[in-house]
UniProtKB/Swiss-Prot annotation:
SUPFAM superfamilies: P-loop containing nucleoside triphosphate hydrolases
Sites where the protein binds ATP: A11, P12, S13, G14, A15, G16, K17, S18
Swiss-Prot/TrEMBL keywords: ATP-binding, Cytoplasm, Kinase, Nucleotide-binding, Transferase
Protein name per its UniProtKB record: Guanylate kinase
Pfam families documented for this protein: Guanylate_kin (PF00625)
Origin species: Escherichia coli (strain K12)
Catalysed conversion reaction: GMP + ATP = GDP + ADP
Residues of the Guanylate kinase-like domain: 4-184
InterPro entries membership: GK/Ca_channel_bsu (IPR008145), Guanylate_kin-like_dom (IPR008144), Guanylate_kinase (IPR017665), Guanylate_kinase_CS (IPR020590), P-loop_NTPase (IPR027417)
Organism ancestry: Bacteria, Pseudomonadati, Pseudomonadota, Gammaproteobacteria, Enterobacterales
Amino acid sequence: MAQGTLYIVSAPSGAGKSSLIQALLKTQPLYDTQVSVSHTTRQPRPGEVHGEHYFFVNHDEFKEMISRDAFLEHAEVFGNYYGTSREAIEQVLATGVDVFLDIDWQGAQQIRQKMPHARSIFILPPSKIELDRRLRGRGQDSEEVIAKRMAQAVAEMSHYAEYDYLIVNDDFDTALTDLKTIIRAERLRMSRQKQRHDALISKLLAD
């Protein structure tokens, strides 16, 4: 069985990466593609469900997991911790399922060091004006928080060149098509096709 591919997806807050990933998953069967559910110490936002969007834990629980080396990556963002379970990711990949990680550039660097075969995708907004509009459209944050998020977005975007692929999310449908194209191309790589069609290739080359 061909090993699944781990996809690292990063973007500044408001660029639409979560929406793109969710839209992609709706077009892919569960036995092909799944999204990693991270642990976090931040409070749930309206509509977020424990175990579906995140595993919400307190700081003591998170630190205990760090001490057990339970995370493939972890980072602090805006005073909250986020981490990805090492065991959960490796188990899913072993079944041939592709896994998507929605993480920031700090987590991406940690993942690439531990899993160099992972593929990484960075998503950019079409402009700062549009990014500001999207951040304000949530209607959840104060001006101070929005300013902080915009500054963080600029810092995040400065790492775009560290990734394998770049998508500009101007038109959502076009960006989604770009994301699907990346996945399709990766599945057609020689290394994965040789594993997937090993029996066929052996028969075709037999005397």
